[in-house]
Amino acid sequence: TATLRENVIALARNIGYTPRSRKAATSAISFIVDTTNITPKPASITLRKGTVAASNGVFGGTSGTFCILDDITVPVVDNIATFNEISIYEGTVIEKNFTYSDRNPQQKFVLPNSGIDTDLIRVGVKNSQSSTATVKYALQDNLFYLGSDSKVYFLQEVADERYEIFFGDGVFGQKLEDSNYITVNYLTSHGDSGNGFSQFA
């Protein structure tokens, strides 16, 4: 039951353990883009993050959407852009933004969706919302080898199968500064039920 799971999660947090999250079904696709009729001629083609393919399942005709988590850019050679063996993931890409306030010590950064594949979370931090430069932060599951300037974030499961992101304290990992703007991209999926797709459009 949900109550039992939340009790287990609470105990796991006490020992610094995060249970395994849902895992998105994955596949790989290859395709080309013919730029012969495109003017002016592009030097490269970029596939933007988000939904890139759809498919019907082999059982019951269930449909699914597949996404990429990051932009992918390839060069155009002889009018052809080749996307080769791109990893795609079943589910929906969601973006959530937060603004850090050092006047709110109880502030929490909770991702509001369940069904998140935690291996596919992307976290970036800017000095402020209007800044143009984004620094990528990496997931860390322990405190070993961390310095005061390590660009890392930590993760813990909270109620209703959701996840909370938190950052360093200035000793173990870099501490956020007031008005830092946090962007989190993540994927919610159907887990194992996303398997069985083989043809994509």
Predicted regions and their residues:
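Signature of Asx- and small-polar-rich beta-strand/turn repeats characteristic
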Residues: 1-201
